[in-house]
Amino acid sequence: MKKTKEIIIDAFWQLLEEKTFNKITVQNIVERCALNRNTFYYHFQDIPNLAEYTVKLWADEIIQNNYEFGSPMTCLSPLVEEFIKHKKAFQHLYSSSQKDEFITYMNHVALHIVQMFMKQSSHYVSRSEDEKETLTHFYKCLMIGILIDWLECQGDYDLKLFVEKIYHLIDSSSQTLL
């Protein structure tokens, strides 16, 4: 049986798929959950607090569920899959007043995923700490840049295919990055 907080979160994500963040009300959420307003306010201060909590929870789940990657670009796969799966919701979050918090959590997830890859990969053993930090920063920025561009373009191109093309271009043109 789902806990009340999870039910509220699920309703919030459903509503994000349907309408912009700024149009979602506490009333919409409690009606969707068949709860009363007091129950909502017992768990969350307001909708921005709910948004922050749910994005952080989403980020933590991606980090916990994805530890093994074959290449720096395959690190992006879990994020790409989530963005495609919840395209409208992420577009609505990105275009909302919670945009800064959303980008902060995206950065957190991307950095963690790339750091996990760097720790696992034998390609980086001989690199200096400074080189490892530089490469980690590069791949994190590349990941976030691609995701933000996709959101800015309203998701009008095949994100998964684009990431695969980028990976092949980097892989074939510069083995020194690996």
List each model region and its residues:
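Alpha-helical bundle regulatory/interaction domains
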Residues: M1-K19, K23-V26, R32-L178
